[in-house]
Amino acid sequence: FNRLPGFGDRPFDMGKHVAIIGVGDVMVDIAHWLIKYKKVERVTAIARRGPVERKYNPKEIRAVCSNMDQEGIATEFARIKDRLAAVGQNADEVLASMTAEFTKCEPTGSPSKMGFRFLASPKRVLVDANNRVRALEMEENKLEPKGEDTAAVGLKQLYEFPVDSVLFAVGDRVDETVGLPYKNGVYVTNPNKTGNDPDDSLFQAYDEKSGQIVEGVFLAGWARKASEGLVGIAKRDGDWCAEVITRY
């Protein structure tokens, strides 16, 4: 997917139906790859909450909206209609709003179909006798108000959702096991401004215990601010970090 040497050229049999867990911009990037380049039969994005809480940018969805299974999406809305109504969400209005974003769709040249499964929490990846993925075990959810937002609450109703592969596109925290100074979901950067442009401190890893920068370690893009902004913003951040490293 990301063309990483040593990994990007490995053969992976994705099968016909691929589930992507998550409904953010990373999900859209992966779906685009599966649809345009792998040409799988079906892609399903799995969401713990409902369509109102989807996180992808409407501009990003243009990359895959020409392959949306709109009939299947309407069926999915009918399935969860009562649970949306329970928190004051009108399924018909939400469906109209969501599908209205399917404009200026980019051609993919692929017969793939894409859909969504809402109010579903994956519990286990199920495999067959050959250790190949055969399904996701999922739990039905309902929505409950949480301040101005909503929270997914499990209904303890489990079911199997047949798929051939599962990809994960969730989480907005960096990996704290890397060993860099870590705090509140992000790696710590230098709080002491240097006055350069771009400012070195924004990209320098920093150890609060010693009060020193981590020599020779720089952070950029989502390693600096996890899941903030679109890919283009992360690229710009990488360009700035490259300037800082060159200066170093």
What are these regions (language model features)?
Residues 1-37, 188-206:
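Glycine-rich dinucleotide-binding loop and its adjacent helix/turn
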Residues 24, 49, 223:
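Residue-level signal for short, function-critical loop segments
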Residues 10-13, 160, 211:
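Short, flexible hinge/linker loops that cap or flank conserved catalytic cores
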Residues 17, 27-161, 178, 245-246:
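Dinucleotide-binding/catalytic capping subdomain of oxidoreductase cores
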Residues 202-229:
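Short FAD-binding loop at a beta-strand-to-alpha-helix junction that anchors the flavin cofactor
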Residues 1-3, 37-38, 139-200:
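Glycine-rich beta-alpha-beta "Rossmann" dinucleotide-binding loop(s) and their flanking helix/strand
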Residues 220-245:
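A conserved FAD-binding loop/helix module that cradles the flavin
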